[in-house]
């Protein structure tokens, strides 16, 4: 088994020096050999995939949307029904257009080679305690994944917001049981899909607050939060690998503690054990998050902060051959978020600076976008011409690097 911890990654031998049962990346018989010359079915490592994923964009506020009333507190006992309780009622309930092939084709044409599809799997789910995913909701997610396959882009699906709903209400053992069941269903449904489909375990809530016996949200201790994070990440990997098919070798994205860079690069965060070598990436969000909310974008402090966050990721993961998936990256910077003494005062310029620093390290940046904010789902173009120029520049740069 291959075990990895942030800052403490072991090789393919156990503590006594005996050779462990780790695949060298070749087909070891656990994954099927496809009767096709389709390159999408060629086994690919996480390192190789990180080089090919290019720039990514999220299909945000779409398949992860759910009943908006009280959505921030999630205080309801079960998932409210939206409209006629059909997949597209949820898909559009936060204002998104119905996803089409043209929307995904446009993303590809604008320079994105990866589409992250956040999914709230609780939608249309019966409140019977079984956590059985709706077949119709699975089918709709499949349709969008198929759009990505046809467009020639990587697709990434996860458990989004539903992780928060579950973690807030259950102890660790019950969370593990539920997430194992959810990922087993998802992985079995997509077991025959090529390696261009990637699974991302969770969103941002690993290590998050939980309801106490009085119904009040309470923060976990760091010790318990790291235990939860590490346990649920291992449950995700075990569930997917246990379904066989192409999931035996599929690249998986491991979610960080809150996807926070400081917490995820701590030595207390552990990468899961896996049956195959180099099939795991780690996911964090927003390399300049605290600067954004402190209204310090564009200044010297902002630049130094980005560099320090990148240095943490390099030391903990990249230097240990663990690719980094920046699952959410700021798309636009409002003027109110800039520092008073900002040297860089243009949103597109700041986007370019961030993408430059991330891609120079080989980090996969995924732009967080909602309906027609950054990329228009009606014109199939990036909304701002300056942003469009930045994306094209880095898309071309990454494409050229692959040809070298």
Enumerate the predicted regions with their spans.
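C-terminal motif of bacterial Sec signal peptides marking the signal peptidase cleavage site
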Residues: 3-4
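Acidic/histidine-rich helix-loop elements
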Residues: 60-99, 127-133, 171, 291-306, ...
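Surface-exposed, active-site-proximal loop segments in enzymatic domains
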Residues: 121-139, 161-177, 207-221, 296-298, ...
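Active-site region of glycoside hydrolase catalytic domains
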Residues: 176-298, 311-332, 356, 360-363
């Amino acid at each position: 088994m291959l075990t990895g911890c942030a800052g403490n990654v072991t090789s393919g031998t156990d503590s006594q020096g005996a050779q462990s049962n780790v695949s060298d990346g070749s087909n070891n018989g656990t994954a099927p050999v496809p009767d096709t010359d389709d390159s999408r079915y060629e086994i690919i490592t996480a390192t190789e995939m990180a080089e090919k994923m290019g720039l990514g964009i999220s299909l945000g506020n779409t398949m992860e949307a759910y009943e908006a009333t009280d959505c921030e507190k999630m205080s309801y006992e079960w998932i409210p029904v939206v409209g006629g309780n059909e997949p597209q009622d949820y898909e559009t309930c936060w204002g998104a257009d119905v996803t089409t092939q043209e929307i995904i084709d446009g993303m590809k044409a604008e320079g994105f080679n990866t589409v992250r599809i956040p999914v709230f799997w609780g939608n249309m789910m019966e409140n019977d305690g079984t956590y059985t995913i709706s077949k119709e909701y699975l089918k709709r997610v499949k349709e969008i994944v198929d759009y990505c396959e046809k467009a020639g882009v990587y697709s990434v699906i996860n458990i989004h917001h539903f992780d928060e709903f579950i973690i807030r209400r259950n102890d660790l053992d019950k969370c593990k049981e539920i997430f194992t069941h959810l990922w087993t269903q998802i992985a079995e449904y997509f077991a025959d899909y090529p390696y261009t489909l990637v699974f991302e375990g969770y969103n941002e809530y690993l290590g998050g607050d939980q309801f106490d016996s009085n119904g009040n949200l309470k923060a976990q201790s760091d010790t318990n939060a790291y235990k939860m994070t590490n346990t649920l990440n291992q449950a995700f990997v075990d569930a997917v690998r246990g379904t066989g098919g192409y999931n035996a070798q599929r690249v998986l994205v491991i979610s960080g503690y809150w996807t926070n860079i400081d917490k995820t690069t701590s030595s207390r965060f552990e990468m899961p054990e896996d049956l195959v070598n180099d099939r795991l990436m780690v996911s964090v969000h927003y390399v300049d998050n605290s600067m954004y909310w402190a209204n310090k974008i564009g200044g010297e402090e902002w630049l130094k902060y980005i560099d320090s966050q990148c240095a943490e990721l390099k030391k903990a993961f990249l230097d240990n051959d663990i690719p980094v998936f920046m699952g959410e990256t700021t798309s636009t910077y409002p003027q109110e978020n800039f520092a008073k003494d900002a040297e860089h005062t243009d949103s597109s310029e700041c986007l370019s600076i961030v993408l430059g620093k991330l891609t120079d390290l080989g980090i996969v940046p995924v732009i967080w976008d909602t309906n027609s904010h950054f990329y228009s789902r009606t014109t199939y173009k990036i909304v701002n011409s300056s942003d469009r120029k930045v994306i094209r520049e880095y898309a071309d740069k990454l494409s050229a690097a692959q040809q070298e």
